């Protein structure tokens, strides 16, 4: 019997639950899967099943994450839920679990709490642009005015971090009650609220662009010269499509150069084009081997530019994760591993921050010694002598 093939007839979207500890993120994750399971759109995942999240290693960082999948009438979703606050921080900064949008869970009984704020800020920093809110534990709030007050607070908090607070969909309900109903095999008034939430997620979080639809970019891994044919650069296409005859730019380390693609090869076979995810060799017209090196990128002209100075949000590995055993201070000069190469840079800490301890997350300003192709959302690792000591994401280009 052939293994069932993953049917790609519905658009795929990645989401995750965020919010303060004990506000009900995991219960909501279980409730969504249980309610949709009654309609045959999900496999029932129990709370304990989601809560005992397996630990994964992502670039040496230990992150506990649960993955569940489900469908609505319109879409297929992959949904991540993390048991601990630290796991969320690591997940969002490393990009280990991509999120196209987030479901922010706020307890109606408590209102926004410190981690509510921190997760909203992190979403803003790492480029999760769409948030839908679930006001949980509505069954514990008798006063309609109190519920309205919490909703207003959440909208204000979202607006404070540049999210459209006034237009954000907010659904009130009870994840626990919906879960209990669904386990009894029916969708009652509480289950309907979870369905309403998913309807809003369907409408409000846009379907992401597929990687092949984005502008072409390929990090250079290696460079060869082939007698009589010219220079070949190899790498894995990160996004977009490249075809023979395309004009491309070579960006990073040195001055940007323009050239034309004269051949695309994969496994020694000539191709018409290479696309996102392909490991290819690209033949470049008139480019000398010594003009290209690992760490540069090939890209669609004008789509990405080289930069030396940027702001970033980083997570510093703990000692247990194989990170540093001691804090670092202002002016710390590690290597920044961006895509395929290490570039030395110095770190400036925010005013008022004396030092950064292993296991912390912090906003930093970095100045590299050589320009690298960067944009908002570019991920990087921080290394010392080849050993990863941190992970980060570019939040703002300075120059």
From Swiss-Prot:
Domain tr-type G as annotated: residue spans: 10-209
Q: Where is this region: G4?
A: 136-139
Give its E.C. classification number. 3.6.5.3
Report the main location listed first in the record.
cytoplasm
PROSITE patterns with a match to the protein in the record: G_TR_1, G_TR_2
Enzyme class comes to hydrolase
Q: Which SUPFAM superfamilies match?
A: EF-Tu/eEF-1alpha/eIF2-gamma C-terminal domain, P-loop containing nucleoside triphosphate hydrolases, Translation proteins
* The entry's keywords: Cytoplasm, Elongation factor, GTP-binding, Hydrolase, Magnesium, Metal-binding, Nucleotide-binding, Protein biosynthesis
Q: Which HAMAP family does the UniProt record give?
A: EF_Tu_B
**What protein name is recorded for this chain?**
Elongation factor Tu
To which species is this protein native? Helicobacter hepaticus (strain ATCC 51449 / 3B1)
Query: What lineage is this protein's organism placed in?
Result: Bacteria, Pseudomonadati, Campylobacterota, Epsilonproteobacteria, Campylobacterales
């Amino acid at each position: 019997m052939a293994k069932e093939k993953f049917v790609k007839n519905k658009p795929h979207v990645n989401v995750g639950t965020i919010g303060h500890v004990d506000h009900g993120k995991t219960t909501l994750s279980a409730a969504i899967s249980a309610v949709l399971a009654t309609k045959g759109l999900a496999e029932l995942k129990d709370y304990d099943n989601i809560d005992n999240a397996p630990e994964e290693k992502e670039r040496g960082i230990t992150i506990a994450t649960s993955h569940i999948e489900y469908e609505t009438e319109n879409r297929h979703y992959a949904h991540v839920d993390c048991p601990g606050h630290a796991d969320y921080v690591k997940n969002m900064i490393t990009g280990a679990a991509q999120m196209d949008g987030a479901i922010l869970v706020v307890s109606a009984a408590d209102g926004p709490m410190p981690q509510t704020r921190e997760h909203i800020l992190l979403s803003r920093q790492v480029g999760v642009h769409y948030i839908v809110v679930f006001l949980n534990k509505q069954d514990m709030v008798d006063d309609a005015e109190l519920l309205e007050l919490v909703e207003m607070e959440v909208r204000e908090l979202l607006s404070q971090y540049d999210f459209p607070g006034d237009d954000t969909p907010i659904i009130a309900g009870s994840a626990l009650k919906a879960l209990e109903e669904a386990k009894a095999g029916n969708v009652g008034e509480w289950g309907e609220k979870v369905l309403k939430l998913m309807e809003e997620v369907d409408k409000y979080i846009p379907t992401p662009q597929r990687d092949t639809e984005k502008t072409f970019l390929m990090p250079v891994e290696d460079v060869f010269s082939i007698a009589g044919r010219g220079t070949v650069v190899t790498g894995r296409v990160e996004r977009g499509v490249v075809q023979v005859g395309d004009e491309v730019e070579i960006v990073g380390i040195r001055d940007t150069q323009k050239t034309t693609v004269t051949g695309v090869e994969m496994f020694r076979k000539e191709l018409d084009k290479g696309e996102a995810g392909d490991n290819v060799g690209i033949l470049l017209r008139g480019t000398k081997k010594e003009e290209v090196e690992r760490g540069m990128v090939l890209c669609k002209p004008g789509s990405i530019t080289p930069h030396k100075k940027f702001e970033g949000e980083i997570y510093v590995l703990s000692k247990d994760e194989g990170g540093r055993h001691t804090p670092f201070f202002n002016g710390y000069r590690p290597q920044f591993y961006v895509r395929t190469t290490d570039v030395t840079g110095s770190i400036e800490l925010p005013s008022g921050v004396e030092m950064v301890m292993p296991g912390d997350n912090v906003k930093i300003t970095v100045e590299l010694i050589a320009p690298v192709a960067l944009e908002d959302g570019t991920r990087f690792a921080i290394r010392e002598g080849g050993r990863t000591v941190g992970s980060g994401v570019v939040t703002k280009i300075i120059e």
